[in-house]
Amino acid sequence: MNRLFVAYKPPFVSSNAFLHKIKKRYRVKKAGFSGTLDPFACGTLIIAFGAYTKLFRFLQKYPKRYRTTIWLGASSPSLDIEKIESIQDVPPLDERTIKDIINSFVGEFTYIPPLFSAKKVGGKRAYHFAARGKQIDLKPVTSTIEEISFVHYRHPFITFEATVSEGTYIRSLAEAIAKKLGFPGTLSYLERLAEGKFVYENENPLDPVQYLRTKQNFVKKSKEAIFHGAKLTIDDLAYKEDGEYHILFDDFFAIIRVEKKKVRYLLNQIPRKYQ
């Protein structure tokens, strides 16, 4: 079975455990997902079966949109509710002040990633060190906050939505907002609403071609020649600029890369029929 769809991961289950349940329900062996969600988080998870598991790196999955709630006064080394260490009383805040501070984060956002994260340090994930109480130095990263909007405030909980670039840690964004308000804070809720055009719609099958980030190209060679991996030259292509392209036929497609006037296949014989 070849299928691409968006599932909705519930909270307090790992993305891998959720995929295992999906595989059992659909009775498939070859399956994968893109964009790991933290166990406590919920929301959209892109799932693929069969040949479509090869497509993840060619899909347009950005920007990503999240809805999240900050618990003001709560402190956690993981910046979420799974490792709460202390809770302090926080006086009620002015809603206008909260909105202004949230809105101030639009644009570039530079921060240190959470210690409990998948960032690599010396070839190992940061969370391996954090779980053992070892101190490590993570380098600052810069993300782009494309949009951010206040949703509501029910003291001591602040909910907002944000559209962000690849690799943004919402936990760090929430912590920075809380600090600017003058208090510690951690996430009590995190939901991924969308990844690019990918949104949850009852696991309906998607046409992968509509979600590719590559540009369509056209070739002089026959469908049969491309299917069998015939060598391509730059003169065979309609678009000759460096980049990655997809070539469509009625029942399959290929993905190629053009670099310094050389052409090579990245994928081929990907079925267009999906279930």
Curated annotation (Swiss-Prot):
InterPro entries: PsdUridine_synth_cat_dom_sf (IPR020103), PsdUridine_synth_N (IPR002501), tRNA_psdUridine_synth_TruB (IPR014780). The keyword Zinc-finger does not apply. One of its GO terms (molecular function) is tRNA pseudouridine(55) synthase activity. Pfam families: TruB_N. Keywords: Isomerase, tRNA processing. Its EC number is 5.4.99.25. One of its GO terms (biological process) is mRNA pseudouridine synthesis. Signal peptide: none annotated. It catalyses: uridine(55) in tRNA = pseudouridine(55) in tRNA. It comes from the Bacteria. The active site is at D38. Responsible for synthesis of pseudouridine from uracil-55 in the psi GC loop of transfer RNAs. Belongs to the pseudouridine synthase TruB family. Type 1 subfamily. This is tRNA pseudouridine synthase B. It comes from Nitratiruptor sp. (strain SB155-2). The lineage of its organism: Bacteria, Pseudomonadati, Campylobacterota, Epsilonproteobacteria, Nautiliales.
